[in-house]
């Protein structure tokens, strides 16, 4: 049984393509979970699988924040919520959206999650919307094409591209570029 199977009810709230993407991101994270501390492996895989759940629970329109808040309301731990709220350079997206980055403080943790953040970014940036494996450059171009040149998401990708490219190169790619 996969984590995707365990969270099928939650994932069913997403569009079918996003379900496939989310399950594959979780599967990829699980395949390299040995790169993070044993105590974080479960949280890593859960967060990777549920990283886009905020698209189904819109409050602010910023899916990373909406997802973390939803998961917190469902009783998920702070590590999972932190990994969701900060996945794939989301602090840059918050800035582009005009959201004060202090919102991330509600999910602060007292442990080092850098390796787990890197794994999720790598898995997310190398997984297509339908769950296939892609090069990170293809993924970024696809996102911008899907949203269009005037979209906030396109502006976010433009600003975050160096970080996302680095993250997509390996499961331990740097989100600190």
Regions found by a protein language model. Name each.
Residues 1-6:
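Short alpha-helical hairpin
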Residues 10-38, 50, 76, 95-96, ...:
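Divalent metal-dependent phosphate-bond-processing catalytic cores, especially two-metal-ion Mg2+/Mn2+ enzymes
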Residues 25, 41-71, 81-91:
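His-Asp-centered metal-binding catalytic motifs of divalent-metal-dependent phosphohydrolases/nucleases
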């Amino acid at each position: 049984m996969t984590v995707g199977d365990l969270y099928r009810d939650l994932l069913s709230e997403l569009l079918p393509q996003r379900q496939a993407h989310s399950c594959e991101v979780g599967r990829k994270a699980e395949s390299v979970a040995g790169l993070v501390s044993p105590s974080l492996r479960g949280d890593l895989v859960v967060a990777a699988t549920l990283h886009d759940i905020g698209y189904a629970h819109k409050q602010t329109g910023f899916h990373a924040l909406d997802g973390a808040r939803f998961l917190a309301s469902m009783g998920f731990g702070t590590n999972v919520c932190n990994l969701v709220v900060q996945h794939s350079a989301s602090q840059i997206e918050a800035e582009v959206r005009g959201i004060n980055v202090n919102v991330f403080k509600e999910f602060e943790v007292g442990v080092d999650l850098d390796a787990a953040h890197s794994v999720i970014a790598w898995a997310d940036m190398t997984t297509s919307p339908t769950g296939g494996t892609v090069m990170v450059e293809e993924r970024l171009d696809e996102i911008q094409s899907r949203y269009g040149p005037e979209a906030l998401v396109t502006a976010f990708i433009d600003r975050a591209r160096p970080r996302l490219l680095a993250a997509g190169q390996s499961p331990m790619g740097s989100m600190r570029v």
